[in-house]
Swiss-Prot record:
NCBIfam families the record matches: LIC
GO CC list: chloride channel complex; dendrite membrane; GABA-A receptor complex; postsynapse; postsynaptic specialization membrane
Cytoplasmic side: 275-279, 334-420
Protein's organism: Gallus gallus (Chicken)
Alphabetized CDD domains for the sequence: LGIC_ECD_GABAAR_A1, LGIC_TM_GABAAR_alpha
Record field: transmembrane: 254-274, 280-301, 312-333, 421-440
Subcellular location: Postsynaptic cell membrane; Cell membrane
Annotated protein name in UniProt: Gamma-aminobutyric acid receptor subunit alpha-1
Glycan-carrying positions: N38, N138
Signal peptide range in chain numbering: 1-27
Organism lineage string: Eukaryota, Metazoa, Chordata, Craniata, Vertebrata
Positions bound to 4-aminobutanoate: R94, T157
Pfam families to which the protein is assigned, alphabetical: Neur_chan_LBD, Neur_chan_memb
Record text on subunit structure and interactions: Heteropentamer, formed by a combination of alpha (GABRA1-6), beta (GABRB1-3), gamma (GABRG1-3), delta (GABRD), epsilon (GABRE), rho (GABRR1-3), pi (GABRP) and theta (GABRQ) subunits, each subunit exhibiting distinct physiological and pharmacological properties.
Lineage: superkingdom: Eukaryota
């Protein structure tokens, strides 16, 4: 009896195990069948959508205007080339429109497709008006996305890198601001056939990623959107425009240009504190500073396009050059008057010639005796001369000529009044110029000169 019960339990356990395995196998088969059914349904929907579809014709042809809604997500902005007046931007460009021919009904509400389907349906012929070169990314496959909803609304997204023109006004360089446009629209369809609109409100239609700035010399202040109509010989076309507002960073130019110019001007004014007789030293100061300013002015223009007007930096360099050249002219003036022997009051200084002193004759006891003659008669040999020697005795005595008190002579080892005046005038004028210059440009409100589409 016990053996029978054990056998029954074993049979019951085996039956449960077989039942579980059977249900699991049936579930897997059911899932595979369901997946196979979904794939089949998906394929049938696509085949039915493309059956009789002509991608050469726009949606609503002859009935309505095709509305294309767009928005842009900027993944990378920059770099910006001042010399070529262009910038590079990497974007996800999204377009959405409605095509009633692509309506469908099925278990899914959205068909998520790739670029293969995009080539079989009608898509807008959008191009960039100010684009110099546009590249659609194809690695590892074309970076395109297509989604079709059951009511026939399509979302078409692609990744693009665009190099576009950016007209720049460099009058305020390097304190300038710019509005770089990105213009796009239909190439073949006029506004009577295809119109463009922004998907969202203007503030959200164009978004820049937080880490999307690739700018070394600019700050991206923001972006604005606009739309307009452009008239051409083939009709009127809708043009969508996005302006990216840029402000230049001045730090690089302060280090590379402004500070060297200021130091060069200060160095040229050091010569005012040297003696006017130090011709070699003052000449070296003047010539060296002039050549330095010439080199700085040339290097400052290398990174800029050859514009026909003067920039703010050009005016600063020109004034600094004028100060340096004026310091050299000032030394030439001082040296001219020094060589001519003229002082500041206009009186000439004539060096006094030394007077010749003649040997005087001294009269003594009605007898002239040469003061510088040393004559001793030999009285022993000539006794007759004893009497003469008594009456005419030679007294060798040095007689000093009468001299007048010397007048104080003017010396040239002094400071010129021109130098004294220049020591005050040059630094004062240069300081006033810097005060006016920086106050004018740094406190100026940015004036964004953005070209507007023709209405």
């Amino acid at each position: 009896m016990k053996r029978l019960l054990v056998l029954c339990d074993c049979l019951w356990a085996w039956s449960l195990l077989l039942n579980a395995l059977t249900e699991r196998s049936y579930g897997q088969t059911s899932s595979q069948d369901e997946l196979k059914d979904n794939t089949t349904v998906f394929t049938r929907i696509l085949d039915r959508l493309l059956d009789g579809y002509d991608n050469r014709l726009r949606p609503g042809l002859g009935e309505r205007v095709t509305e294309v809604k767009t928005d842009i997500f900027v993944t990378s902005f920059g770099p910006v080339s001042d010399h070529d007046m262009e910038y590079t931007i990497d974007v996800f460009f999204r377009q959405s429109w409605k095509d009633e021919r692509l309506k469908f009904k099925g278990p899914m509400t959205v068909l998520r497709l790739n670029n293969l389907m995009a080539s079989k349906i009608w898509t807008p012929d959008t191009f960039f008006h100010n684009g110099k070169k546009s590249v659609a990314h194809n690695m590892t496959m074309p970076n395109k996305l297509l989604r079709i909803t059951e009511d026939g609304t399509l979302l078409y997204t692609m990744r693009l890198t665009v190099r576009a023109e950016c007209p720049m006004h460099l009058e305020d360089f390097p304190m300038d601001v710019h509005a770089c446009p990105l213009k796009f629209g239909s190439y073949a369809y006029t506004r009577a056939e295809v119109v463009y609109e922004w998907t969202r409100e203007p503030a959200r239609s164009v978004v820049v990623a937080e880490d999307g700035s690739r700018l070394n010399q600019y700050d991206l202040l923001g972006q604005t959107v606009d739309s307009g109509i452009v008239q051409s010989s083939t009709g009127e076309y809708v043009v969508m425009t996005t302006h990216f507002h840029l402000k230049r960073k001045i730090g690089y130019f302060v280090i590379q240009t402004y500070l060297p110019c200021i130091m060069t001007v200060i160095l040229s004014q050091v010569s005012f504190w040297l003696n006017r007789e130090s011709v070699p030293a003052r000449t070296v100061f003047g010539v060296t500073t002039v050549l330095t300013m010439t080199t700085l002015s040339i290097s400052a223009r290398n990174s800029l396009p050859k514009v026909a007007y003067a920039t703010a930096m050009d005016w600063f360099i020109a004034v600094c050059y004028a100060f340096v050249f004026s310091a050299l002219i000032e030394f030439a003036t001082v040296n001219y008057f020094t060589k001519r022997g003229y002082a500041w009051d206009g009186k000439s200084v004539v060096p006094e010639k030394p007077k010749k002193v003649k040997d005087p004759l001294i009269k003594k006891n009605n007898t002239y005796t040469a003061a510088a003659t040393s004559y001793t008669p030999n009285i022993a040999r000539d006794p007759g001369l004893a009497t003469i020697a008594k009456s005419a005795t030679i007294e060798p005595k040095e007689v000093k000529p009468e001299t007048k008190p010397a007048e104080p002579k003017k010396t040239f080892n002094s400071v010129s009044k021109i130098d004294r005046l220049s020591r005050i005038a040059f630094p004062l004028l240069f300081g006033i110029f810097n005060l006016v210059y920086w106050a004018t440009y740094l406190n100026r409100e940015p004036q964004l000169k953005a070209p507007t589409p023709h209405q």
